[in-house]
Amino acid sequence: PHPALVLHHDPSPAVCTSAIVDRHLGGVHRAWAVVGAFGDNLDETAAALARTLDLDATSVAALKRLGECLNYNAYGDSVDELLVHPVELLRRMAGFARPADFAAAEPVFAQIDRAMQDDIVCAHALAPIDADAAVACFELPDAAWSRRVSGAFANRLARANPRRAHAV
């Protein structure tokens, strides 16, 4: 490894990269860490981080929505299937210290949010190919929208039925 490389690792299932970076930076950009944790479906971790920011419920819900949208935009077989190329999205986000300002100012957020909601509706319209109290299996069509929504859909299934395994 490079002599300047410093590794930060936490194997806890309740810790994501955003939480590790937040810890390393001493919470300087904690609102972005909240967004990242929500995007990774670590709602309890995100909520704990958000409590340190003294945010109201509406603000926390907005950070959750942004995290889910950014996560949704990361799914696809190739960057061509994404709504916004990751480099372009990073370029747009980089100018904002606060995620709420990004969400309010950048029309790309509304574009991603609208597409995610449309795709979630399509995914929820599908019946599982097999389901019981312990497991539910969903087969999504071979289409870009279904690859984009697979993570968001799986996360929602897991949140709605935490005692049941889900295959998407």
Give short role names for the model-derived ranges.
Residues 45-125:
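Accessory alpha-helical/coil subdomains and C-terminal extensions
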Residues 91-168:
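Gly/His-enriched, cation/cofactor- and phosphate-binding structural elements
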